[in-house]
């Protein structure tokens, strides 16, 4: 494994993450793929602050969440506690994970796979999925597919990529000169 960078190097602050990612508009998509059996074992890789993990657990599912970033997991544990849920949140790198158990459903949501920058790292993460997935299990991967024409045509324009308020009421606007 090439460990020149850490998964989550660029998304490490739970306040910023929650400020940017407070929508649950994609939750219905993931719920559609969940096993009908509520006793099924579910694993969310790159769970962040529990944005999806917690609502799925509230529906009665047995779910574990894995993330590399400690501040994200601390926030996830805090949210789960406030919701009266006991969820196992695990700090680990998805390129090296070994939980010693198999799951019925594993998913990597919300473009999180893009935190792996090299093919070998992606392959390592997919091997981890294979090693943790039951024989008849389901793996779901959500990733962004960019519009190359838009990127080329708008490469020099500045774009607002996010406006948000963190939990401590700080307002922020993030901009980029890179095409979106």
What residues fall within each predicted segment?
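Conserved beta-strand signature within the Rossmann-like core of class I S-adenosyl-L-methionine
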Residues: 136-143
């Amino acid at each position: 494994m090439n460990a020149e960078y850490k998964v989550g190097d660029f998304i490490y602050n739970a306040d910023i993450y929650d400020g940017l990612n407070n929508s649950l508009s994609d939750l219905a998509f993931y719920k559609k793929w969940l096993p009908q059996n509520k006793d099924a074992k579910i694993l969310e890789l790159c769970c962040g602050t529990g944005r999806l993990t917690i609502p799925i657990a509230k529906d009665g599912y047995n779910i574990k969440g894995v993330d590399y970033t400690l501040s994200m997991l601390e926030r996830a544990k805090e949210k789960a506690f406030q919701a009266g849920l006991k969820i196992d949140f695990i700090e680990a790198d998805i390129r090296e994970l070994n939980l010693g158990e198999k799951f019925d459903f594993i998913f990597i949501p919300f473009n999180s796979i893009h935190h792996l920058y090299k093919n070998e790292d992606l392959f390592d993460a997919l091997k981890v999925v294979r090693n943790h997935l039951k024989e008849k299990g389901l793996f779901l991967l959500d990733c962004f597919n960019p519009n190359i024409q838009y990127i080329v045509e708008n490469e020099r324009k500045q774009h607002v990529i996010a406006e948000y308020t963190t939990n401590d009421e700080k307002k922020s606007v993030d901009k980029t000169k890179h095409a979106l």
